[in-house]
């Protein structure tokens, strides 16, 4: 039986009632800087500027950020009645949802919170209504930690069972981006599965793609692995296919920013490349994400808005801030942050806190609604 995770991990979200501090992940691993979140504008900027990133962490930070900002305004008299608090909460949720478009966790979380805010009693005192929202936001955080733990256990058990069926007692995993403690409330999704394998002594090695242009794999995933002495090999993004050809990779495990009704998955740019290569090389690819990442309202990846960011993220050195690409009147830069992996390329399964759904033999390969409906 898999042991329950209990190890200490990095914290990117430091929350106590009335206080929220977020780790500026753009500065890792060279600097460890926490920013105070005092206003709704603060949390919007933190998400937009990618100081906080990772779909689950974005949602949790948004909920807690709005809670702290509301509590402060109620305490200093800017919000004088329960109705004013209720109105502020609803408009704040709408505003924060404009920060980034692709990760569905943010929208699922804030839409759910808005529905619960509508049910609050506006005739109560401002502080009382604000406190009611604080408790709702804290539940978002607590639930995400529990989701992490479920994903870890289910994913590790499933992958290890498949390896044992082939006579292997330990496994090597390939992943992309950062899907660990820095991207969630505690342990992670895809990297959480890696963590559980490591905690149970069943991880041979994790291979981390550098993940251009923000280098989340090189800067963040490697940073997490080094902190816990998890055996890790960093590779250039373009080396993944050669890795699958020349070394034994038991599975590719990736995270998700949105999983559509049919299983099509939006994730960090480069995930689609890995999926195509994994299919060719006969390596199972798994998507690990909480049910808050499932989007039953979007039929397929064709309907997902893909965020595109500034060209400078590609042309400028992240550390020195110097341009390292030649310029000219006919040069253009295309910088999509995410891509869509079609469900037929998710050959291993979708891992959630509820278990692992393996693909069907033919299309539709996944039924996301049935995962949500599970007890």
From Swiss-Prot:
Gene3D superfamilies: translation initiation factor eif-2b, domain 1, Translation initiation factor eif-2b, domain 2. InterPro entries: IF-2B-related, IF-M1Pi, IF_2B-like_C, Initiation_fac_2B_a/b/d, M1Pi_N, NagB/RpiA_transferase-like. The keyword Amino-acid biosynthesis applies. Pathway: Amino-acid biosynthesis; L-methionine biosynthesis via salvage pathway; L-methionine from S-methyl-5-thio-alpha-D-ribose 1-phosphate: step 1/6. One of its GO terms (molecular function) is S-methyl-5-thioribose-1-phosphate isomerase activity. It holds the Pfam family IF-2B. Coiled coil: none annotated. It is found in: Cytoplasm; Nucleus. The active site is at 257 (proton donor). Keywords: Amino-acid biosynthesis, Cytoplasm, Isomerase, Methionine biosynthesis, Nucleus. The keyword Cytoplasm applies. Belongs to the eIF-2B alpha/beta/delta subunits family. MtnA subfamily. Catalyzes the interconversion of methylthioribose-1-phosphate (MTR-1-P) into methylthioribulose-1-phosphate (MTRu-1-P). HAMAP family: Salvage_MtnA. This is Methylthioribose-1-phosphate isomerase.
């Amino acid at each position: 039986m898999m042991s329950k995770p209990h190890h200490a991990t990095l914290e990117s979200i430091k929350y106590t009632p009335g206080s929220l501090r977020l780790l500026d992940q753009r500065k890792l691993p060279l600097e460890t800087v926490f920013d105070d979140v005092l206003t709704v504008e603060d949390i919007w900027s933190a998400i937009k500027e990618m100081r906080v990133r990772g779909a689950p962490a974005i949602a949790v930070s948004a909920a807690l950020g709005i809670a702290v900002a509301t509590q402060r305004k109620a305490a200093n008299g800017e919000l004088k009645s329960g109705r004013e608090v209720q109105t502020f909460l609803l408009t704040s949720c709408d505003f924060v949802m404009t920060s980034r478009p692709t990760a569905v966790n943010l929208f699922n979380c804030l839409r759910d919170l808005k529905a619960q805010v509508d049910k609050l009693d506006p005739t109560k005192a401002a502080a009382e209504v604000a406190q009611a929202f604080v408790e709702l936001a804290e539940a978002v955080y607590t639930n995400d930690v529990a989701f992490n733990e479920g994903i870890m256990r289910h994913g590790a058990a499933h992958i290890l069972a498949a390896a044992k069926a082939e006579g292997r007692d330990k496994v090597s995993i390939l992943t992309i981006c950062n899907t660990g403690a820095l991207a969630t409330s505690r342990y992670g999704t895809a990297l959480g599965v890696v963590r559980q394998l490591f905690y149970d002594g069943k991880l041979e090695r994790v291979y981390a793609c550098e993940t251009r242009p923000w280098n989340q794999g090189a800067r963040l995933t490697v940073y997490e692995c080094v902190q816990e002495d998890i055996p890790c090999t960093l590779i250039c993004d373009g080396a993944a296919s050669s890795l699958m050809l020349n070394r034994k990779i038991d599975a590719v495990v990736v995270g998700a920013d949105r999983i559509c009704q049919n299983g099509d998955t939006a994730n960090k740019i480069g995930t689609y490349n890995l999926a195509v290569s994994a299919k060719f090389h006969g390596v199972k690819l798994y998507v690990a994400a909480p049910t808050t990442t499932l989007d039953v309202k979007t039929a397929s990846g064709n309907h997902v808005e893909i965020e595109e960011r500034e060209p400078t993220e590609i042309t400028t050195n992240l550390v020195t801030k110097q341009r390292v690409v030649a310029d000219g009147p006919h040069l253009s830069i295309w910088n999509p942050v995410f891509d869509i992996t079609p469900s037929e390329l998710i050959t291993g399964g979708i891992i959630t806190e509820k278990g692992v759904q393996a693909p069907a033999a033919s299309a539709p390969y996944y039924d996301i609604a049935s995962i949500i409906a599970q007890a």
